[in-house]
A protein has these predicted regions:
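Catalytic center-proximal scaffold of phosphoryl-transfer enzymes
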Residues: 2-6, 11-233
Length: 233
């Protein structure tokens, strides 16, 4: 609502300026757009169901309109996404893993194909980046890892090797994944497998102590050198 005010003198009319719009020449407010995206991506409520809910309240919105709002709202979030990518990479320590996700195939009604979430975690400031890619091929991580320098922690998937060998990158393994192999070895060589599992359990206890006491990164490093390194050696 924009109120108009006329001067008592009769000299002209004053009207408030329109608020800045999120979408150029569009009517949805920032709160409406954030609701649409939250409902869809956090609460798993597709846009067509949101359209039906609006209709029950007597608000008719064309499918093309609400879909256009969603698309343009996502475009407005791109600077935030780029900032998240930068923040996630900037500390020089990344933990990376990839996992499957079923994706609806727009060319085949009702059909799905298998896509991948590549997940990047920065343990220093706890930022997490979910990056969808249609494949598990190593090239899927190129836009994130090609210019990354620092500590890169992954499982044993061969796709990470080319990034771990880059200059300025120290490739770290993962004890959780390594532990699985010793569990598998219990049936073949129980004594040595149990020794390895017991040793890894000691490492976990040290990490638990660091977490429970909220140790700073430098203090964690000193703790690992003092307590964890002898266990590994």
């Amino acid at each position: 609502i924009r109120h108009k005010y006329a001067h008592k003198s009769g000299e002209g009319v004053m009207i408030g300026e329109l608020p800045e719009r999120v979408i150029d020449k569009g009517i949805p407010s920032a709160s409406l757009l954030s609701m649409l995206l939250t409902n869809k991506y956090l609460d798993h409520l597709p846009l067509y169901r949101q359209k039906q809910r609006f209709a029950r309240d007597g608000i008719e919105i064309a499918s093309s309109t609400i879909e256009g709002w969603g698309k343009q709202a996502l475009g407005k979030l791109e600077p935030l996404y780029e900032s998240l990518v930068l923040d996630t990479k900037s500390q020089g320590y990344l933990q990376v893993d990839e996992t499957t996700i079923k994706v609806l195939d727009k060319d085949k009604k009702g059909a799905c194909h298998l896509g991948y979430y590549w997940v990047y975690h920065n343990p220093m400031d706890k930022t997490v980046l979910f990056d969808y890619q249609p494949t598990r091929a190593a090239r899927s991580a190129a836009h994130i890892l090609d210019n990354f320098r620092g500590y890169l922690q992954t499982d044993g998937y061969a796709g990470y090797e080319q990034y771990g060998k880059k200059e300025g990158v120290t490739h770290l393994a993962c004890w959780a994944h390594a532990r699985r192999e010793f569990e598998k070895a219990l049936d073949n060589d129980r004594e040595r497998a149990e020794f390895a599992l017991f040793s890894i359990q000691k490492l976990y206890a040290i990490e638990r102590y660091a977490k429970e006491n909220n140790l700073e990164p430098e203090a964690i490093k000193e703790l690992r050198l003092k307590e964890s390194l002898p266990v590994i050696n």
